[in-house]
Amino acid sequence: MKTILVVDDELASAEVLSLILEEEGYRTFCTANGQQGLARVRDIQPQLVVLDYMMPVMNGADMAQALREMPETRHIKILMNSSLPEDAVRLHFSKYDAFLRKPYNVDVALSLIASLLKA
């Protein structure tokens, strides 16, 4: 079973996505910021992190950068999402595997997640 960590300060949104992913057969966990997300990654060793770009404490770009810098987490797929256009996000960080603009269509998100986990 593939494990996905959803990191988003909008916890209701994260929990809804988590429930949808669980219905699709994934094991999911949620955290509210990048700092909590990094701590959780060490415990659960996910194959994918669905990461909100704009969060307090540690934003998505900083968490993604930390994941890419550590040899033990460098392989984890990152799906960055934001209400900002992707061009604005890429100005600050571009080492993610895919981007999803909020609000997103659930079917599009599921398809993207499935393709990331197959790669």
Residue locations for each model-derived region?
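Hydrophobic/aromatic residues positioned on beta-strands within the core alpha/beta folds
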Residues: 79-81
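Conserved phosphotransfer cores of two-component systems
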Residues: 42-44, 68-74, 94
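Receiver (REC) domain active-site loop signature in two-component systems and cognate sites
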Residues: 55
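Active-site residues of response regulator receiver
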Residues: 52
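C-terminal output helix
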Residues: 104-115
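Charged docking surfaces used in two-component/phosphorelay signaling
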Residues: 15-23
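Short hydrophobic/Thr-rich beta-strand motif most characteristic of the beta2 strand and flanking loop
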Residues: 25-32, 40
